[in-house]
Curated annotation (Swiss-Prot):
Stated name of the protein: 4-hydroxy-tetrahydrodipicolinate reductase
Pathway: Amino-acid biosynthesis; L-lysine biosynthesis via DAP pathway; (S)-tetrahydrodipicolinate from L-aspartate: step 4/4
Binding site for (S)-2,3,4,5-tetrahydrodipicolinate: H160, G169, T170
Main location: cytoplasm
Binding-site list for NAD(+): G12, A13, G14, G15, R16, M17, E38, G102, T103, T104, A126, A127, N128, F129
């Protein structure tokens, strides 16, 4: 990729996040919308992507076959579902198109496929593209190194009623940031549910609690609780536009990298702090 204008493709263009992404592209310099894709059979196929997103005519017609549109974009933004994202990943890898992936809920095989594809194309893969959330992840690393060994750690997350995976990708990223800072593996210390007679809390575990209700965009709190005090680090999103802007910024940053697997901490240079 060159330093010229980045042409962006958006899959799931007619969804809540897809429309916000189209809006974000039109609001930022250095990028243009090159393609918009919806699932086969969608009534939105054939419509203008700009009119669909409420930003006016863009002369980009919504298609239903990514493989036929690869000449129209440099970077694909994908906030869909794991099975769809992996199909799109194969197409992008074949045609050497970079990807920004905000899809959550991948199993280990899916994550491995993304890592393998990054040998050939540039990929920014993040559970959350908000600047604030990624600052929180850095703060959690610092807090875990100081307090993690002697406090009870709980992560509470809340999202809208339509979210299909739990815990959220961001909640898991918070857990991984904490566990990594403590030299542990999250899979060995996570507790994802409690019901009935559970006995006392086991030391060294990281608990998760999930809320699904109404139109909550996204709220996450990590709690470090001791006797007599607790520290809570919280992020609340009130608009999906914060995620959309972060994803679009990632496409510009990714233009400097022909291949490799990155996350938002790379994009924001947080790893240097």
């Amino acid at each position: 990729m060159t330093d010229s204008t980045i042409r962006i493709a958006i899959v799931g263009a007619g969804g809540r996040m897809g429309r916000q992404l189209i809006q974000a592209v039109t609001q930022m310099e250095g990028v243009v919308l090159g393609a918009a894709i919806e699932r086969k059979g969608s009534t939105l196929v054939g419509s203008d992507a700009g009119e669909l997103a409420g930003v006016g005519l863009l002369n980009v017609i919504v298609g239903d076959d990514l493989s036929q549109l690869t000449d129209n974009f440099d970077v694909l933004i994908d906030f869909t579902r794991p099975e769809g994202t992996l199909e799109h990943l194969a197409i992008c890898r074949q045609h050497r198109k970079a990807m920004v992936i905000g899809t959550t809920g991948f199993d280990e095989a899916g994550k491995a496929a993304i890592s393998e594809a990054a040998a050939d194309i540039g990929i920014v893969f993040a559970a959350n593209f908000s600047v604030g959330v990624n600052v929180v992840l850095k703060l959690l690393e610092k807090a875990a190194k100081v307090m993690g060994d002697y406090t009870d750690i709980e992560i509470i997350e809340a999202h809208h009623r339509h979210k299909v995976d739990a815990p959220s990708g961001t909640a898991l990223a918070m857990g991984e940031a904490i566990a990594d800072a403590m030299g542990r593996s999250l899979k060995d210390c996570a507790v994802y549910s409690r019901e009935g007679y559970t006995g006392e809390r086991k030391p060294g575990t990281i608990g998760f609690a999930t809320v699904r209700a109404g139109d909550i965009v996204g709220e996450h709190t990590a709690m470090f609780a001791d006797i007599g005090e607790r520290v809570e680090i919280t992020h609340k999103a009130t608009s999906r536009m914060t995620f959309a802007h972060g994803a679009v910024k990632s496409t510009i940053w990714l233009g400097k990298h022909d291949n490799g697997l990155f996350d938002m901490r790379d994009v924001l240079n947080l790893n240097e702090l």
